[in-house]
UniProtKB/Swiss-Prot annotation:
Residues 178-346 are annotated as: Spacer. Mg(2+) binds at D429, D551, D552. Multifunctional enzyme that converts the viral RNA genome into dsDNA in viral cytoplasmic capsids. This enzyme displays a DNA polymerase activity that can copy either DNA or RNA templates, and a ribonuclease H (RNase H) activity that cleaves the RNA strand of RNA-DNA heteroduplexes in a partially processive 3'- to 5'-endonucleasic mode. Neo-synthesized pregenomic RNA (pgRNA) are encapsidated together with the P protein, and reverse-transcribed inside the nucleocapsid. It catalyses: DNA(n) + a 2'-deoxyribonucleoside 5'-triphosphate = DNA(n+1) + diphosphate; Endonucleolytic cleavage to 5'-phosphomonoester. Signal peptide: none annotated. SUPFAM superfamilies: DNA/RNA polymerases (SSF56672). This is Protein P. InterPro entries: DNA/RNA_pol_sf (IPR043502), DNApol_viral_C (IPR001462), DNApol_viral_N (IPR000201), HBV_DPOL (IPR037531), Rev_trsase/Diguanyl_cyclase (IPR043128), RT_dom (IPR000477), Viral_Replic_Matur_Polypro (IPR051320). GO terms for biological process: DNA replication; symbiont-mediated suppression of host innate immune response. Residues 262-277, 287-299 have a biased composition (Polar residues). It comes from Hepatitis B virus genotype H (isolate United States/LAS2523/2002). Residues 180-202, 226-315 are annotated as: Disordered. The lineage of its organism: Viruses, Riboviria, Pararnavirae, Artverviricota, Revtraviricetes. The gene is P. The record marks Y63 as: Priming of reverse-transcription by covalently linking the first nucleotide of the (-)DNA. One of its GO terms (molecular function) is DNA binding.
Length: 843
């Protein structure tokens, strides 16, 4: 006969009419009973032949992937001028006095951050933008390309200009200024890694007349065409104080994408003479453009008379130029949907390439990418804006994977101990938190994203058109890419992007200047950064509480008025060091803080309402007596596991599900087990804050007996059959709690101390979790444990009762930094009547 739910509750001692605990509880450790109950509840894992269920509510498992939804109206989020000040440490010291060792070490980690993996795989540019939306290939290409362009303009990305140079926008850091082109001495340079580079403001190279004298100045080498040493090598001071740099290595292509061919001169000429026709048109209109001028970030103007890398091919090919987009201008339309109709809409499509405000030397950067990108909704609640997903998973895979540094995440009890109080709370929203932290330029070659240009991208993902390397740029295959879909897509995109369609249709390679989200190092660095900043704020305002997890910052104060003044002071400090806050998203919580999925108040912690709603929804859709795919079980356990500490039986109640996932078997929910779990999760109990106190109750056990010391009273008992020592110790702790009601118990068993009851027999683990809920444990060495003698049957001997204090812990999160013993060296502040008692400290 199947086990009923009421009978099962009585078995787990969850009802009050159970017998004496000392008799009932040891029975739950019996292996035979556990097996019989598992059979009755259908918790065994038979190999079922019935087809598995792969979907429960929103949870999907094997063989069913959710189809991503593309939104053609996605907006690209704007990125403010994010620039974390380099003198961050000095500004913090002005604010709070000398920094602690921990704070200084953490802030130095991110100024700048460094990332040097052992092995980096490079992928062809075609894999730069992932064809994530097969139905919206062109739309997705341009929206992603626009997102990348926005990041570059915001100073978050470097743009690869050549093998050894890159450009960027925004304010340069000192380590970037040391690498600037043209800012170092140009005498005695070694190799091409130190060559100066010139910005071209128009992005178009002007071509002087081709002549054989120029050709002789170059020599062929393993790295392509190299300038002969000694010619034009010395910088000369111009009459207006301008620095005249020597010609950059001719293997630099304006697009930042070098040809993948073997270096044949005809190929080089075609690829390098970017938009030859358009630059000629512009030269006639504006003769001053014949010598491109730009500015390096030091403010000196740098002049560059550009030299064609080859003459062999340019003469034979005539005026065939490599700008795929503009080639359509001079061709006959092939159909009503020919791209030439769109290209002829505008006379001036703007430059083919843009260059940044500043240029630096970089380590060798191939014309490849190391990760693909695609767009998704910003979050489930905001589908109007897009978010860029960067896939750098290569660094987490294989034998050469990077082992990311670990960092402490506050567990539920630590969080409750720290934040459960009668404070008023608010949350601060840091805009694009990851993009605050600068990366060293030497890490750029490992974190490359980009695209191969529209023509190659369309050719790769469409089955009708093909562009082959040896034909690239020739008129025969130009119209192969014309199609109705492409024509309609481009016409619609023209409404949005206008002449930028031309710029975005060119290839580009970008490297990260700030830490990207797709690398395991980034969460670690962000956690170090925000925890150091919060530590500084806590020491500046010792009567308040500041705490962070990743980019989530919370402030607490005794009263709302005090919180308002604290908010003003802290936001001014954060803005002064370059941390960009989105003040519109500041949330004032009152006395119940919403943080990390929890609601934390003076009464303790509970899961947020939306999580409770998800759990109810999950149980409503959970099928009974049907095998559920173990992958779906993983998703269910992920949701239920988050709320498990708030239930009677906790994690042990989920052990049958964990077992099926480990065995990779389907799981069948029996009506009784589902009803048991459902009842568990419908009544949630808050996790309370631990209070400091003195331990006066001790428990100990041997395999055959147990002993308690409650104040000056001693008790002992024996088990019917010998038990494993950990099980015996757990039973002793349960007896101590039930007999004394004390919430602080001393024990010498590390497994009981850890409060992880999932390794015990299933029924015992569930019952013990409920009995010991809210109990704090203190470690007492066996030799000093007053309950040691009673557990061995010796009641006559009384060891002196220890005075063991219990102090609640906040874990390894190093959240609360006390003021250092050194004087603060701050000018005397104007004191105001604080609404707080001076002696009050955060919990």
């Amino acid at each position: 006969m199947p086990l009923s739910y009421q009978h099962f509750r009585r078995l787990l001692l969850l009802d009050n009419e159970a017998g004496p605990l000392e008799e009932e509880l040891p029975r739950l450790a019996d292996e035979d009973l556990n097996h019989r109950v598992a059979e009755d509840l259908n918790l065994q894992l038979p190999n079922v032949s019935i087809p598995w269920t792969h979907k429960v509510g929103n949870f999907t498992g094997l063989y069913s992937s959710t189809i991503p939804v593309f939104n053609p109206d996605w907006l690209t989020p704007s990125f403010p001028d994010i620039h974390l000040h380099q003198d961050l440490i000095q500004k913090c010291e002005q604010f709070v006095g000398p920094l602690t060792t921990n704070e200084r070490r953490r802030l130095k980690l991110i100024m700048p951050a460094r990332f040097y993996p052992k092995v980096t795989k490079y992928f062809p540019l075609d894999k730069g933008i992932k064809p994530y939306y097969p139905e919206n290939v062109v739309n997705h290409y341009f929206k992603t390309r626009h997102y990348l362009h926005t990041l570059w303009k915001a100073g978050i990305l470097y743009k690869r200009e050549s093998t050894h140079s890159a450009s960027f926008c925004g304010s340069p850091y000192s380590w970037e200024q040391e690498l600037q082109h043209g800012s170092t001495s140009l005498n005695g340079e070694k190799g091409h890694g130190t060559e100066p580079f010139c910005a071209q403001s128009s992005g178009i190279l002007s071509r002087p007349p081709v002549g054989s004298t120029i050709q002789s100045k170059f020599q062929q080498s393993r790295l392509g065409l190299q300038h002969k040493q000694g010619q034009l090598a010395n910088g000369k001071q111009g009459r207006s104080g301008r620095l005249r740099s020597r010609v950059h290595t001719p293997t630099r292509w304006p697009s930042g994408v070098e040809p993948s061919g073997t270096g044949h001169s005809d190929n080089l000429a075609t690829r390098s003479t970017s938009c030859f026709h358009q630059s000629e048109v512009r030269k006639k209109a504006n003769p001053s453009l014949s010598t491109s001028k730009g500015h390096t970030s030091t403010g000196h103007a740098v002049e560059l008379n550009t030299v064609p890398p080859s003459t062999v091919g340019s003469e034979s090919k005539g005026s065939v130029f490599s700008c795929w987009w503009l080639q359509f201008r001079n061709t006959e339309p092939c159909s009503d949907y020919c791209l030439s109709h769109i290209i002829n809409l505008l006379e001036d499509w703007g430059p083919c390439y843009e260059h940044g405000e500043h240029h630096i030397r970089t380590p060798k950067t191939p014309s490849r990418v190391t990760g693909g990108v695609f767009l998704v909704d910003k979050n489930p609640h905001n589908t109007t804006e897009s978010r860029l997903v960067v896939d750098f998973s290569q660094f987490s895979r294989g034998t050469t994977r990077v082992s990311w540094p670990k960092f402490a995440v506050p567990n539920l009890q630590s969080l409750t101990n720290l934040l459960s109080s009668n404070l008023s709370w608010l949350s601060l929203d840091v805009s694009a938190a990851f993009y605050h932290l600068p990366l060293h330029p030497a890490a750029m070659p490992h974190l490359l994203v980009g695209s191969s240009g529209l023509s190659r991208y369309v050719a790769r993902v469409s089955s009708t058109s093909r562009i082959y390397n040896h034909q690239h740029g020739t008129l025969q295959n130009l119209h192969h890419s014309c199609s109705r879909n492409l024509y309609v897509s481009l016409l619609l995109l023209y409404q949005t992007f206008g002449r930028k369609l031309h710029l975005y249709s060119h290839p580009i390679i970008l490297g990260f200047r700030k830490i990207p989200m797709g690398v395991g190092l980034s969460p670690f660095l962000l956690a170090q950064f925000t925890s150091a900043i919060c530590s500084v704020v806590r020491r500046a305002f010792p009567h308040c509480l500041a705490f962070s997890y990743m980019d989530d910052l919370v402030l607490g104060a005794k009263s709302v008025q005090h919180l308002e003044s604290l908010y003003t002071a802290v936001t001014n400090f954060l803005l002064s060091v370059g941390i960009h806050l989105n003040t519109a998203k500041t949330k004032w919580w009152g006395y119940s803080l919403h943080f990390m999925g929890y609601i934390i108040g003076s009464w303790g912690t509970l899961p947020q309402e939306h999580i409770v709603h998800k759990i109810k929804d999950c149980f409503r859709k959970l099928p009974v007596n049907r095998p559920i795919d173990w992958k779906v079980c993983q998703r269910i356990v992920g949701l239920l596991g988050f709320a498990a500490p708030f239930t009677q039986c906790g994690y042990p109640a989920l052990m049958p599900l964990y077992a099926c996932i480990t065995a990779k078997q389907a799981f069948v929910f029996s009506p009784t087990y589902k009803a048991f779990l459902c009842k568990q999760y419908m009544n949630l109990y808050p996790v309370a804050r631990q209070r400091p106190g003195l331990c006066q109750v001790f428990a100990d056990a041997t395999p055959t007996g147990w002993g308690l010391a409650i104040g000056h009273q001693r008790m002992r008992g024996t088990f019917v059959a010998p038990l494993p020592i950990h099980t015996a110790e757990l039973l002793a702790a349960c007896f101590a709690r039930s007999r004394s009601g004390a919430d602080i118990i001393g024990t010498d068993n590390s497994v009981v101390l850890s409060r992880k009851y999932t390794s015990f027999p299933w029924l015992l683990g569930c019952a013990a979790n409920w009995i010991l809920r809210g109990t704090s444990f203190v470690y007492v060495p066996s030799a000093l444990n007053p309950a040691d003698d009673p557990s061995r049957g010796r009641l006559g001997l009384c060891r002196p009762l220890l005075r063991l204090p219990f102090r609640p812990t906040t874990g390894r999160t190093s959240l609360y930094a006390d003021s250092p013993p050194v004087p603060s060296h701050l000018p005397a502040r104007v004191h105001f009547a604080s609404p707080l008692h001076v002696a009050w400290r955060p919990p």
